[in-house]
Amino acid sequence: MRKKIFNWLGKGFVALSAEGKPAASTAAEAHGIFQRFNEELKGLGLSLDNTVRSRLWGRDRESRDQGSIERSKALSGKARSASSSFICPIHFDSDAHVALDLLAMRPARADAQKFLKEYEPPIVPLRYLVYDSVVVLSGVTAVLPTLEDQMANILPRIEGSLKDAGSSWERAVKASFLLHRSQKFETLDQLFQKQVKAKIPQMEYYHVDGYSSEGKLIEIEVTATV
């Protein structure tokens, strides 16, 4: 397991990353990761309820799907949070079938509560959360013929969620782009800058091999402030 403790946006954050340990099933691997995460967070006076974002990695589609089901169980109720998931065999250093990245936040105000916004109707991913003035959106995707088509669909939806949360692209502090390996980062950047003029302080890029369903070419995660 990797653990990083840092301050950002006037809050305390804990980033945890781990691959599954040998288990009877992928679901059991994922369950074990969340148990380990919860123990780490408890040692810092936090719990899974402080989760604001999780990113799930599967070795293949079946692993992603089973891991996603287990994550929905582990991060339910007060632990519900922004999420994304990917298929990416080269992400793994072990023989694990599933890996997880989790970001937990210690709010500056002890009485701060998460505001959870669902899609209508609700689906597996949360639309976004607001926690002590921090806005965290789940990864946003689309199934359309080309990357250009998908970006033209995704970016206005992100803008709508930011506006609904009391934020905007101008208040975005981080954007993560998880691009299908068949696509070029240069093309992605051109498409993004064509539609979004705001200067985002942190922008990170990954190549992945698959998503929650076939036909997706990009998933974008955004964090902002209100």
Show the residue positions of the predicted features.
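N-terminal presequence-like segments and the immediate start of the first folded domain
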Residues: 1-173, 179-226
